Amino acid sequence: MVYTALTWQRLHGTAAGLVPSHLPQEGEKGSTHPTPRPLGTTPRVTAHIEPPRPWAAGAEPPLPAGDGSARESSPFIGSAAADGDSLLEGKNMALFEEEMDSNPMVSSLLNKLANYTNLSQGVVDHEEAEDSRPRESKAPCMGTFIGVYLPCLQNILGVILFLRLTWIVGAAGVLESFLVVSMCCTCTMLTAVSMSAIATNGVVPAGGSYYMISRSLGPEFGGAVGLCFYLGTTFAGAMYILGTIEIFLTYISPGAAVFQAETPEGEAAALLHNMRVYGSCTLALMAVVVFVGVKYVNKLALVFLACVVLSILAIYAGVIKTAFDPPDIPVCLLGNRTLARRGFDTCAKVRAVSNGTATTALWGLFCNGSSLDTACNEYFAQNNVTEIQGIPGVASGVLLDNLWSAYSDRGAFVEKKGVASVPTPEDGRASGLPYVLSDITTYFTVLVGIYFPSVTGIMAGSNRSGDLKDAQKSIPTGTILAIVTTSFIYLSCIVLFGACIEGVVLRDKFGEALQGNLVIGMLAWPSPWVIVIGSFFSTCGAGLQSLTGAPRLLQAIARDGIVPFLQVFGHGKANGEPTWALLLTALICETGILIASLDSVAPILSMFFLMCYMFVNLACAVQTLLRTPNWRPRFKYYHWTLSFLGMSLCLALMFICSWYYALFAMLIAGCIYKYIEYRGAEKEWGDGIRGLSLNAARYALLRVEHGPPHTKNWRPQVLVMLTLDAEQRVTHPRLLSFTSQLKAGKGLTIVGSVLEGTFLDKHVEAQRAEENIRALMGAEKMKGFCQLVVSSSLRDGCSHLIQAAGLGGMKHNTVLMAWPEAWKQPDSPYSWKYFVDTVRDTTAAQQALLVAKNIDAFPQNQERFSEGSIDVWWVVHDGGMLMLLPFLLRQHKVWRKCRMRIFTVAQVDDNSVQMKKDLQMFLYHLRISAEVEVVEMVENDISAFTYEKTLLMEQRSQMLKQMQLTKGEREREAQLIHDRNTASHTAASRAQAPPTPDKVQMTWTKEKLTAEKHRNKDAGAAGFRDLFSLKPDHSNVRRMHTAVKLNGVVLSRSQDAQLVLLNMPGPPKNRQGDENYMEFLEVLTEGLNRVVLVRGGGREVITIYS
């Protein structure tokens, strides 16, 4: 190097006479420091974090609220608002000052990056519109228990538990019921694991499950799944309303029925008609409540949840009570057939009276008269009437009788196993007799379809994401705990029901053998009414919640605009309430109510929820297998095999429940998918397989041509700029090794190089060079494209590659090149000029630039680092690429065991403690694990080392401009000038008097003493003396000060790092200082082993929402 005579001692000493008087001396006031920024200001950030755009020309940046800081009001170093009296104001970061408007200091952004605020929608807007008083904006404050666990618990536990679980246990037996519940709970648990990975892959937006799914799956899948989720939620509302009416008409007020059955055979039809009438009225009432006062629905949610919890506690209390005091609940059997307790009170054929024997009311139901000699039903005549206990208790041993299934056909008798019965030929099996009959045909798959809705509701926590204090932590924890809790409740209830309740009572769906009482209510303690009233209010509340959530879901889909014919439903009242969406939801819900049967509606919503869960698992599996850069879930306990198993289980359950419903639901989802995908797109058919492949490639290229990818989907698509030697071999093969470690075979990689000359003369060399490059790419196992350009100059060839490499949307957004190590050597005098122009070209093309320094020291793919660190020095914020690179590198085996450390620089007036907290919070939201350190750079005086290094740099530059030398002579002449200058200063220093106290003694080195003894006494040296009287430019002094200071700080902490990533300052706007720019970068990275200089292009973004 030119400056070999400069020693480390000069960092601490000042050469006499070298520091001009206008520089601030030790103890003098060189600059004024403004008051620190108040810590209370927390700006709201609700979108992805991008580099801020420059302010309007001539305008001052807005002053943050409550901050009177002069520097904060003008955050750009060297701006017009800076203190004009101090030429060295902000000299610590002067190297980056020309781009401070677009790439601000990290310290000025950390507070905004870390302390984002979610915007909640829907209900909050409605409440604020209805309340005339001004509200203070409240930060999200819900924790895991209140915000996720309890809502999931309320949504999962519901109508099926109270109305159908005992019947499922009776029909399928304890073992098969256990299998049904285990399958469904396993399905939701695997889905919850996949959902947790998706929910923790970025900040969950305040829009709930649809936003989470659609932003992960894309518009096509997102729209299809979103509509399936909407239809499932809507039919869930119908199911809850039907459950509410069934409880009311069957167990609370049977006399309120509008339609009365004249015969026992007409009871089922009358019940369906009553369900339709009351269900429609209830739906209308609930829709009015949701339209008028949705805030009351949310305030009553805890009341409804309390009903559910109390009902479940009453069940467990009743089970415990049966162990020592079983209730007296007699059930009447005729032979082995269960009798419905209607029209008789005594379970006997005859009864004893004072003067003999008399027939009972039961006799009159089976015989033509009340006398003992009248003709009776043959089965009644040949079988005895017995009475058993309906709930014999836990200690009775009835569990063994209930272990196995007892499926039956529709209209079959509910019979007790093991009881003697004399079969008789029947004509008209029931014919109006008081038997308990099966109302539907039961088998395993039917019960799965009916039961599955009881495990849905796992997304209730993510629907409240905008109100959660820490959604990334609360959603996985609360959801999985809720599923574990409810799974335990369901599985334990299956065993307890089978151990406590007689089998015929379990199979009695409507409690006809118990005088029309709810079976699970008769088990509960202290009263059956606890269960009846609790289940009534819980199902009513669940229906209200469905009618509240479904219209908002439809409104979100409509506002996304992915399904054009639904856009009308995105509008609503002035306060944002989804009026039209509520109307459509009520109409769809009415179709479910007109079906009128809870057992028929349940499989429908099972299909839609299973479809939704299947795509959630698919999304997680695909994201994991693709390893996209934005896939960094904070929830680590997921694997693609679990997601694939969950997806397969969802698909299997769909066809188990009902194959024709499954095909119908998939057809709906497929039609929606294709409608969104091909909306406005032209289809073109090719000929044969080749034509199909070419058409698919063309279609895919046209799809990505329409615009740049969304910021969340940004990933580095790399153009690698290689240099070739005279034999067309790659000069730095490890640049390709580094590329393969960075890309890991994913995304686009273009390897480019330039040959100087004309294509007619160089086409053979070009082919040989391309073959060499492809062979090297194969050796490095790197998949990509090779593009070689022959150009009249290297400069133009590099520019052409940057502009034109790639095809259509498959274009690079990042340029990777090696640092020109020989830029000072005589044989490559223009290498620095090509390099600086390439930097400018990438900036103009809005492409990121990676410059690998000391590339030959980088590891090959076969090497492994067993320890060490990747150090990121984040000085200015230019889009977040610095954060993304170490994450991508650590996916490769070479760098996997390296830990990541992030350093950022604080100035004197920055609160470094708060900066560290903000940076840790920002990294937490980015899902990046790294050690964090804030380094304080004190604005001390510029050292003599910096001043003299700047002076020598400018003298060399000025001399080369004055002397018209040949290319080979320039470097040698510059070295000669440096030697003469050294000798001249040595002679002048000897003639001087001893230093005064305000001067600092120069430290002499052995090299300088040798130079003094053997100095060149050529008289021509005097001719250069006027050149050395120049004073260095103040801006160059400040830039060199930045480079020296920052280099010293980086060396002190990262000298032993395996890799250092550092912000790359932009080239000067004045092209006359290009060679100085190279010197600044050289000083900035001096002493570091492996360095990658990173310069953002403005489009790359790493976001907290990815």
Curated annotation (Swiss-Prot):
<feature type="topological domain" description="Extracellular">
    <location>
        <begin position="167"/>
        <end position="173"/>
    </location>
</feature>
<feature type="glycosylation site" description="N-linked (GlcNAc...) asparagine">
    <location>
        <position position="384"/>
    </location>
</feature>
<feature type="binding site">
    <location>
        <position position="155"/>
    </location>
    <ligand>
        <name>K(+)</name>
    </ligand>
</feature>
<dbReference type="GO" id="GO:0071805">
    <property type="term" value="P:potassium ion transmembrane transport"/>
</dbReference>
<feature type="topological domain" description="Cytoplasmic">
    <location>
        <begin position="623"/>
        <end position="636"/>
    </location>
</feature>
<dbReference type="InterPro" id="IPR000076">
    <property type="entry name" value="KCL_cotranspt"/>
</dbReference>
<feature type="binding site">
    <location>
        <position position="456"/>
    </location>
    <ligand>
        <name>K(+)</name>
    </ligand>
</feature>
<keyword id="KW-0633">Potassium transport</keyword>
<keyword id="KW-0812">Transmembrane</keyword>
<dbReference type="InterPro" id="IPR018491">
    <property type="entry name" value="SLC12_C"/>
</dbReference>
<dbReference type="GO" id="GO:0005886">
    <property type="term" value="C:plasma membrane"/>
</dbReference>
<comment type="subunit">
    <text>Homodimer; adopts a domain-swap conformation at the scissor helices connecting the transmembrane domain and C-terminal domain. Heterodimer with K-Cl cotransporter SLC12A5.</text>
</comment>
<keyword id="KW-0868">Chloride</keyword>
<feature type="modified residue" description="Phosphothreonine">
    <location>
        <position position="996"/>
    </location>
</feature>
<feature type="binding site">
    <location>
        <position position="457"/>
    </location>
    <ligand>
        <name>chloride 1</name>
    </ligand>
</feature>
<feature type="topological domain" description="Cytoplasmic">
    <location>
        <begin position="556"/>
        <end position="578"/>
    </location>
</feature>
<feature type="modified residue" description="Phosphothreonine">
    <location>
        <position position="1003"/>
    </location>
</feature>
<dbReference type="GO" id="GO:1990573">
    <property type="term" value="P:potassium ion import across plasma membrane"/>
</dbReference>
<comment type="function">
    <text>Mediates electroneutral potassium-chloride cotransport when activated by cell swelling. May mediate K(+) uptake into Deiters' cells in the cochlea and contribute to K(+) recycling in the inner ear. Important for the survival of cochlear outer and inner hair cells and the maintenance of the organ of Corti. May be required for basolateral Cl(-) extrusion in the kidney and contribute to renal acidification.</text>
</comment>
<feature type="transmembrane region" description="Helical; Name=10">
    <location>
        <begin position="598"/>
        <end position="622"/>
    </location>
</feature>
<feature type="transmembrane region" description="Helical; Name=12">
    <location>
        <begin position="660"/>
        <end position="675"/>
    </location>
</feature>
<feature type="binding site">
    <location>
        <position position="613"/>
    </location>
    <ligand>
        <name>chloride 1</name>
    </ligand>
</feature>
<feature type="transmembrane region" description="Helical; Name=11">
    <location>
        <begin position="637"/>
        <end position="659"/>
    </location>
</feature>
<feature type="topological domain" description="Extracellular">
    <location>
        <begin position="325"/>
        <end position="443"/>
    </location>
</feature>
<keyword id="KW-0325">Glycoprotein</keyword>
<dbReference type="GO" id="GO:0046872">
    <property type="term" value="F:metal ion binding"/>
</dbReference>
<feature type="binding site">
    <location>
        <position position="159"/>
    </location>
    <ligand>
        <name>chloride 2</name>
    </ligand>
</feature>
<dbReference type="GO" id="GO:0006884">
    <property type="term" value="P:cell volume homeostasis"/>
</dbReference>
<feature type="topological domain" description="Cytoplasmic">
    <location>
        <begin position="197"/>
        <end position="220"/>
    </location>
</feature>
<feature type="region of interest" description="Disordered">
    <location>
        <begin position="980"/>
        <end position="999"/>
    </location>
</feature>
<feature type="topological domain" description="Extracellular">
    <location>
        <begin position="498"/>
        <end position="528"/>
    </location>
</feature>
<keyword id="KW-0769">Symport</keyword>
<feature type="transmembrane region" description="Helical; Name=9">
    <location>
        <begin position="579"/>
        <end position="597"/>
    </location>
</feature>
<keyword id="KW-1133">Transmembrane helix</keyword>
<dbReference type="GO" id="GO:0015379">
    <property type="term" value="F:potassium:chloride symporter activity"/>
</dbReference>
<dbReference type="GO" id="GO:0055064">
    <property type="term" value="P:chloride ion homeostasis"/>
</dbReference>
<feature type="transmembrane region" description="Helical; Name=2">
    <location>
        <begin position="174"/>
        <end position="196"/>
    </location>
</feature>
<feature type="transmembrane region" description="Helical; Name=5">
    <location>
        <begin position="296"/>
        <end position="324"/>
    </location>
</feature>
<dbReference type="Pfam" id="PF03522">
    <property type="entry name" value="SLC12"/>
</dbReference>
<keyword id="KW-0813">Transport</keyword>
<dbReference type="GO" id="GO:0045202">
    <property type="term" value="C:synapse"/>
</dbReference>
<feature type="region of interest" description="Scissor helix">
    <location>
        <begin position="688"/>
        <end position="704"/>
    </location>
</feature>
